[in-house]
Amino acid sequence: MRQATIKRETKETQIEISLNLDEQSGIEIDTGIGFLNHMLNLFAKHGRFGLVVKCHGDLDVDPHHTTEDTGIVLGECFKQALGDKQGIERYGTEFVPMDETLGQVSVDLSGRSYLVFDAELTNPRLGGLDTETVEDFFQAVAFAAEMNLHARILYGRNTHHKVESLFKAFGRAMRAAVTINPDIQGVNSTKGVI
């Protein structure tokens, strides 16, 4: 079973995340930010992951630390749960429509950290979440998981729909990338390591 539980405590946040790649063993999300909870729930549901997130952050300051640190720990969970990455597909690309919006996320579980984020989020706040922290979340996940992550909105108007499209596409792209293919011997790289 590919799974991980990681705790991270700083003066700004206390976070514990449990991730199960192979079984949708339950989804429980509590970050203290309703909109972030909603997005992580969508991510786990559409990625078919078991995900438990418990976070207490300094929301009296702002949502930045909670959002970024949640991304860090989620990325660390993916890295740990994937282990040596034997037999995984490695790549995933998904387009997800949300009414007038179309989002795309592509990932490469390459061992190299990189984020390309191309989404104009015109509404500065969604519930308790500053929309500028959406990019911070994806950067934190990409760097902690050591993966390439490209997230973009091809078109759309509603900021909620844009962010929701990206989180759903991220879940589906990660599902594709972590899937074990019995035809892949070792790791999916000519280098022999990823």
Curated annotation (Swiss-Prot):
It is found in: Cytoplasm. Signal peptide: none annotated. Gene3D superfamilies: Imidazole glycerol phosphate dehydratase, domain 1 (3.30.230.40). Its EC number is 4.2.1.19. The keyword ATP-binding does not apply. InterPro entries: IGPD_sf, ImidazoleglycerolP_deHydtase, ImidazoleglycerP_deHydtase_CS, Ribosomal_Su5_D2-typ_SF. One of its GO terms (cellular component) is cytoplasm. GO terms for biological process: L-histidine biosynthetic process. SUPFAM superfamilies: Ribosomal protein S5 domain 2-like (SSF54211). Pfam families: IGPD. One of its GO terms (molecular function) is imidazoleglycerol-phosphate dehydratase activity. Coiled coil: none annotated. Pathway: Amino-acid biosynthesis; L-histidine biosynthesis; L-histidine from 5-phospho-alpha-D-ribose 1-diphosphate: step 6/9. This is Imidazoleglycerol-phosphate dehydratase. It comes from Lactiplantibacillus plantarum (strain ATCC BAA-793 / NCIMB 8826 / WCFS1) (Lactobacillus plantarum).
